[in-house]
Amino acid sequence: MPSYRSRISTHGRNMAGARGLWRATGMKDADFGKPIIAIANSFTQFVPGHVHLKDLGQLVAQQIEIAGGVAKEFNTIAVDDGIAMGHDGMLYSLPSREIIADSVEYMVNAHCADALVCISNCDKITPGMLMAALRLNIPTIFVSGGPMEAGKIKWKDQDLRVDLVDAMIAAASEHNSEEEVAEMERAACPTCGSCSGMFTANSMNCLTEALGLSLPGNGSVLATHRDRRMLFEEAGRQIVALVKRYYEKDDETVLPRSIASRKAFENAMTVDIAMGGSTNTVLHLLAAAQEGEVDFTMTDIDHLSRRVPVLCKVAPAVANVHMEDVHRAGGIMGLLGELDAAGLIDTSTYTVHAKTMKEALDHWDIKQTNEPTVCAFYRAAPGGIPTQRAFSQSCRYETLDLDRAKGVIRDKEHAYSQDGGLAVLYGNLAKDGCIVKTAGVDQSILTFKGPARIFESQDSAVSAILNDKIKTGEIVLIRYEGPRGGPGMQEMLYPTSYLKSKGLGKVCALVTDGRFSGGSSGLSIGHVSPEAAEGGEIALVEEGDIIEIDIPNRSIHMLVDDVEMKQRRAKMAAKGNGAWQPIEKRQRKVSKALKAYAAMTTSAAKGAVRNI
């Protein structure tokens, strides 16, 4: 029977000093012997997805105390990718994931906590905390801040629902006036919460549900809705129940590595492919799998992508569907239900809230249950009032979206596409693979062939696009933006948004060893591995080389023969210390922190985790 980890600092005569310090935090005699449960919050006023989290840790703490535990809250950092986008701030986004993982590990292990509740929400915070949870392998529950409401605007005589990507596209188009752009900007992000489409933050929060590490509705119920309060309170109660099962009954099925098994990772990736989630999820799931010592690789993702259909399309893949609509259709439990009916997931996996995923679906899938509380929960609707307050409204839809033929979530028979929403491409340009979000690609360009336009920074590519130097049929190739080459593997939301604003979104492609925001769409191929700075073939592409992309056949090739490629590689190697570096002089300050990240990071094909 495992002992409480916290006993090492709360019991024994030699720990009198430690107990004295615990008492100074508010602990009483009766508290020594209770489980100490860490609450990792990520409140910050910099990020709309986290601005409302300040007091929510105490909601969890109250329930932990009532259930017989001792709650201790701490905070970690959170970077807003949207605010960091388009300048050197984006270099820090992906590296912050490792710092978040480390900070959670440091706090939990330094203070010998017995269990963990992770309050996350946005892009790198959920993955960082997930990595930490799998390292620590103590009872853990995730509860996120929830998605933002979609913006609503009457714009150019149209009633639209919008998000931040719409504001970016509007601003880049010369056809919109300053007043029109300002109007769109003010409407795009009306409330607290993670951005309203199926971007990285919401994708990852949905995937914690699929992994079994968070409660039903975690990925979809709005940040503003009072129903989300129930998730925080239940997380506090449930974590104590998990603690008792592990420490008092020796039940290892409640541990993160038991819950997030290989089968659970396959389930999560299946959900991601079926809903056309962010390509960043590939990076983060690979990283988390390595932390949990789970044998889950790009090869597995490739196999899944060939058999999983697209059952759900959300902005930016389609303009009029946001997370509030996914929730009305049953959320991730509804999507898992359809995948289960199609025989595409394994429901024997464990969860933090039910013994198995099958048991969870029996209760929470709106197509399988008539439970009034469940049906009411999934009718939670937006309030339509700008706010930064959590749980500030209680609006409900009159009906659920149960239409699996034409609704937001489809069954396999009525899938948007029988081919998955994400694909792994291989070829002489990406020997270790690259990723494309096929759910956001127009059917007319699933195969594409064109000349490469070479750029060695995101900035130079953006300048070329905005100055009309990119023409129909060309492939914008941005290199030396990978984990090591950037360093930090910047997101390329601005180049993709500007291509769309210039009317090139369906007639051009973008290929990079960097990555894309969950808000990106179009023929955007990222994570090219090996990256340029690692000696990848992408560094050897020359201006005008023809690149052939074939998504149905999962291939990406540059039409250059092997003899020529060997000559180019030899020429590059002859540069000595100057090899595998951008020729273009980049105006980029690389700090010691970023240099340290670059020195230790691995390829995107391995999740860009550190090689230690």
Swiss-Prot record:
Recorded superkingdom: Bacteria
Active site per UniProt: S517 (proton acceptor)
Keywords annotated in UniProt: 2Fe-2S, Amino-acid biosynthesis, Branched-chain amino acid biosynthesis, Iron, Iron-sulfur, Lyase, Magnesium, Metal-binding
Catalysed reaction equations from the record: (2R)-2,3-dihydroxy-3-methylbutanoate = 3-methyl-2-oxobutanoate + H2O; (2R,3R)-2,3-dihydroxy-3-methylpentanoate = (S)-3-methyl-2-oxopentanoate + H2O
Positions of post-translational N6-carboxylysine modification: K124
One of the GO biological process terms: isoleucine biosynthetic process
EC number(s) per entry: 4.2.1.9
Cofactor dependency: [2Fe-2S] cluster; Mg(2+)
Cofactor note: Binds 1 [2Fe-2S] cluster per subunit. This cluster acts as a Lewis acid cofactor.
Binding site for Mg(2+): D81, D123, K124, E491
Gene Ontology terms: cellular component: cytosol
Pathway: Amino-acid biosynthesis; L-isoleucine biosynthesis; L-isoleucine from 2-oxobutanoate: step 3/4; Amino-acid biosynthesis; L-valine biosynthesis; L-valine from pyruvate: step 3/4
Enzyme class: lyase
PANTHER family membership: D-XYLONATE DEHYDRATASE, D-XYLONATE DEHYDRATASE YAGF-RELATED
Subunit field text: Homodimer.
Functional description taken from the UniProt entry: Functions in the biosynthesis of branched-chain amino acids. Catalyzes the dehydration of (2R,3R)-2,3-dihydroxy-3-methylpentanoate (2,3-dihydroxy-3-methylvalerate) into 2-oxo-3-methylpentanoate (2-oxo-3-methylvalerate) and of (2R)-2,3-dihydroxy-3-methylbutanoate (2,3-dihydroxyisovalerate) into 2-oxo-3-methylbutanoate (2-oxoisovalerate), the penultimate precursor to L-isoleucine and L-valine, respectively.
Stated name of the protein: Dihydroxy-acid dehydratase
Source species: Bartonella tribocorum (strain CIP 105476 / IBS 506)
